[in-house]
Amino acid sequence: MEEVAVKKRGRPSKASVGGKSSTAAVAAISPGIKKRGRPAKNKGSSGGGGQRGRPPKASKIQNDEDPEDEGEEDGDGDGSGAELANNSSPSPTKGRGRPKSSGGAGSGSGDSVKTPGSAKKRKAGRPKKHQPSDSENEDDQDEDDDGNSSIEERRPVGRPSAGSVNLNISRTGRGLGRPKKRAVESNGDGEPQVPKKRGRPPQNKSGSGGSTGYVPTGRPRGRPKANAAPVEKHEDNDDDQDDENSGEEEHSSPEKTVVAPKKRGRPSLAAGKVSKEETTKPRSRPAKNIDDDADDADSADQGQHNSKKESNDEDRAVDGTPTKGDGLKWNSDGENDANDGYVSDNYNDSESVAA
């Protein structure tokens, strides 16, 4: 008994098995009506349940064609619906498929009558908002309340003005921009567009059609940087372009002369000697190397002083007169000059005494 009530989907098979005596009974009762599809679930068992989902399409047509069949099936409608809902009906009288709108007792008929009407009133999905009608009513009320209806008629349809500045948002969604002004000028006079130029004017140009625009070369433009290494790299890479553009070589030559490796900081002492010695000597003993350099420098300085003394001595010997005597003469002269008064006084005194 329970095996007969198992849910079966799709079209029923034509070959009736022993458990499918319900279809034969339905065919015997109403041979003209052929029912297919799933049986009704909530029909008859729950009074206010009704049919869920899409409402029946051909319900009214079937009601008009077979009013007598409805009366015959009303008697067995409740029991069959309840048994189908409980899955314990051995021979349901209604059969499978979508039930009729008028099938079942008064409650079933009421549900069937309500479903098409409710489907029309209530549509599936989200209900629509009634904003247009409300806005129209509000506009009518505003016009009735405000005496200045002519002012509102002058306003364009769309978003109201911001209050201070009319940005023309209602039509375009954007404010008055630059293109509109250009359009007015072009409509009035075609000439103002040519001389009116925006942006930075071209520099070192004889005119708009005089010389060509910027020709991209690898050489940097403007004042060269302090670091000359990247500039030299650019110059090395652009030797081919310099050969092609002979006129630009004159401009590049002053850049080469101007840009020189700029040395900053304190120059290194005896850099050449240190570099030569570093190539020959290991760098494990820097202190001794520095001392040796200092000693060498001191010895060189002493040698220079000695050579100067020797040259001075040779000059004195060549003159024939001893330099020491010259120095003494010069010093003696100075001393005599300083002591002239004292010596002369003594001499005069002696002469005066002798006389």
Curated annotation (Swiss-Prot):
Subcellular localization: Nucleus; Chromosome
SMART domains assigned: AT_hook (SM00384)
Keyword entries, A-Z: Acetylation, Chromosome, DNA-binding, Nucleus, Phosphoprotein, Repeat
Record's compositionally biased regions (Acidic residues): 64-77, 135-147, 237-247
DNA-binding region: 7-14, 34-41, 60-67, 94-101, 122-129, 155-162, 174-181, 196-203, 219-226, 262-269, 281-288
GO molecular function annotation: minor groove of adenine-thymine-rich DNA binding; satellite DNA binding
GO cellular component terms, A-Z: cytoplasm; heterochromatin; nucleosome; nucleus; polytene chromosome
Main location: nucleus
Region named Disordered: 1-355
Pfam families per UniProt: AT_hook
The keyword Phosphoprotein is assigned to this record: yes
Modified residues (Phosphothreonine): T115, T321
Feature: compositional bias, Polar residues: 345-355
Reported function: This satellite DNA-associated protein is a double-stranded DNA binding protein specific for tracts of pure at DNA. It may play a role in organizing the higher-order structure of euchromatin as well as heterochromatin.
Name of this protein: Chromosomal protein D1
The encoding gene: D1
